[in-house]
């Protein structure tokens, strides 16, 4: 029988390190609550980034997924995770920096060498050259469900990367800084609304699940966290369009208080004609445009 999460960490002398952005969760009930929020289906193929001392890992495994692959960069955590694997052979452990992982390649590698069940081996892997559209290849046989407590300093970057590979993802249930979650879920004409809101909502259905107080962690961070769930849309915009939206929103929100006709005039010389054609008020500021408005502008460029 495995010891408690905290005792297991103590036995292996695994203390949180600032350089890894580590704040450990020792509360198994909180870990269970996160997994419940994911609505994890039995026999799912799950990916977790930064398992650390394995609290969330245990809760996922108790739901009997087909497999759980964890990506951990801290070598100190590996013996602890390997002990969990003795009880759950469907746990796959990869030592790697999450920022260096390409989800497309990882999915195929896991299928062929690490342990995901792969029932249609004649299907060729999707390479970056082929995967031009975020939602293409719906018949992909190795979609993953991502459940993770992400380090604050890389969380936003990972979310954007994963959304661009949404064809490989069933859903993402993530713990992030509360401020980031509020930005992801924000609606137009609110203070939190910005580039992150636009990109996330064009590719996925987003839902804030619940807040997590600093006292839930060891050591307690200085800010609140929150759980967010993102479910990729069935027919999201192409990567090419999303890249254009990123370019447009970068300019638009850089001058947040400027009217859109001013902030975009260098990128879109005929901005007045474009706004008129799309029936968008030319006195609107960046925060007043809905995600679909930015997409419509991108489609015209």
UniProtKB/Swiss-Prot annotation:
Keywords: Cytoplasm, Methyltransferase, RNA-binding, rRNA processing, S-adenosyl-L-methionine, Transferase. It comes from Rickettsia conorii (strain ATCC VR-613 / Malish 7). SMART domains: rADc. GO terms for molecular function: 16S rRNA (adenine(1518)-N(6)/adenine(1519)-N(6))-dimethyltransferase activity; RNA binding. This is Ribosomal RNA small subunit methyltransferase A. InterPro entries: KsgA/Erm (IPR001737), RPE2 (IPR022436), rRNA_Ade_diMease-like_C (IPR023165), rRNA_Ade_Mease_Trfase_CS (IPR020596), rRNA_Ade_methylase_Trfase_N (IPR020598), rRNA_adenine_dimethylase (IPR011530), SAM-dependent_MTases_sf (IPR029063). Disulfide bonds: none annotated. S-adenosyl-L-methionine binds at residues 23, 25, 50, 72, 97, 149. Pfam families: RrnaAD. The gene is rsmA. The keyword S-adenosyl-L-methionine applies. It comes from the Bacteria. Belongs to the class I-like SAM-binding methyltransferase superfamily. rRNA adenine N(6)-methyltransferase family. RsmA subfamily. PROSITE patterns: RRNA_A_DIMETH (PS01131), SAM_RNA_A_N6_MT (PS51689).
């Amino acid at each position: 029988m495995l010891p408690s999460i905290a005792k297991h960490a103590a036995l292996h002398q695994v203390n949180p390190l600032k350089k890894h952005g580590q704040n450990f969760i020792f509360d198994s009930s909180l870990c269970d609550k996160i997994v419940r929020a994911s609505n994890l289906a039995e026999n799912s193929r799950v990916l977790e980034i930064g398992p650390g001392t394995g609290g969330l890992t245990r809760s996922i495994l108790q739901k009997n997924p087909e497999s759980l692959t964890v990506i951990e960069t801290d070598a100190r955590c590996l013996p602890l995770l390997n002990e969990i694997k003795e009880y759950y052979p469907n746990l796959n452990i990869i030592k790697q920096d999450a920022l260096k992982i390409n989800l497309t390649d990882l999915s195929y590698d896991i299928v062929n060498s690490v342990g995901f069940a792969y029932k249609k081996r004649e299907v060729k892997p999707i390479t970056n050259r082929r995967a031009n559209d975020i939602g293409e290849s719906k018949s992909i046989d190795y979609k993953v469900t991502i459940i993770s407590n992400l380090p604050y300093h890389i969380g936003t970057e990972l979310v954007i990367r994963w959304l661009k590979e949404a064809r490989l993802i069933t859903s993402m249930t993530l713990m992030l800084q509360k401020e980031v979650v509020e930005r992801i879920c924000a609606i137009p004409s609110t203070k939190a609304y910005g580039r992150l809101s636009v990109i996330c909502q064009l590719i996925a259905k987003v839902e804030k699940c619940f807040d997590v107080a600093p006292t839930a962690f060891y050591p307690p961070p200085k800010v609140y966290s929150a759980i967010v769930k993102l479910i990729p849309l069935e027919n999201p915009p192409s990567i090419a369009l999303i890249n254009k939206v990123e370019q447009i929103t970068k300019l638009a929100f850089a001058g947040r208080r400027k009217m859109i006709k001013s902030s975009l005039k260098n990128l879109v010389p005929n901005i007045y004609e474009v706004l008129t054609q799309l029936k968008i008020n030319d006195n609107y500021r960046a925060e007043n445009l809905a995600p679909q408005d930015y997409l419509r502008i991108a489609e015209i460029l």
